[in-house]
């Protein structure tokens, strides 16, 4: 989850820099309202994943009984948000993000391969629900 949060933060930073340096109609594209809204949504996704991952790590460090539950929550939240952030950031970049010269595709690929390297979000979500059910 921490790796995914780091990837989201890096992708967000690259995207904001691009929005502030790419000019269209004589002004940075980051000034356009629709792009501002998308960038704000990216930040919400990054920060929500970061918060869940931080809480899960703190719970694990303290040895609390909820650590397994929060680990599953952090795992699928960060995986889902990482895929969403990278896909939306690529859309904000436009065509340049699809080229090998730009690093955006590397973050997107990392977000996608997380599904195969670790468990899928659906599997993690199922484990989370089973753990929640067991606690009831």
Annotated model-derived regions:
Residues 1-136:
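Alpha-helical interface subdomain recognition
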């Amino acid at each position: 989850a921490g790796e995914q949060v780091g990837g989201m933060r890096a992708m967000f930073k690259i995207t904001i820099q691009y929005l502030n340096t790419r000019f269209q109609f004589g002004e940075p594209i980051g000034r356009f309202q629709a792009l501002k809204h998308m960038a704000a949504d990216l930040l919400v996704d990054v920060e929500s994943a970061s918060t869940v991952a931080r809480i899960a790590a703190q719970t694990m460090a303290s040895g609390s009984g909820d650590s397994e539950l929060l680990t599953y929550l952090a795992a699928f939240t960060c995986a889902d948000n990482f895929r969403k952030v990278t896909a939306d950031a690529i859309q904000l970049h436009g065509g340049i993000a699809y080229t090998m010269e730009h690093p955006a595709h590397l973050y997107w690929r990392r977000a996608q391969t997380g599904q195969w390297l670790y468990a899928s979000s659906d599997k993690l979500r199922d484990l989370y629900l089973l753990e929640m059910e067991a606690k009831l």
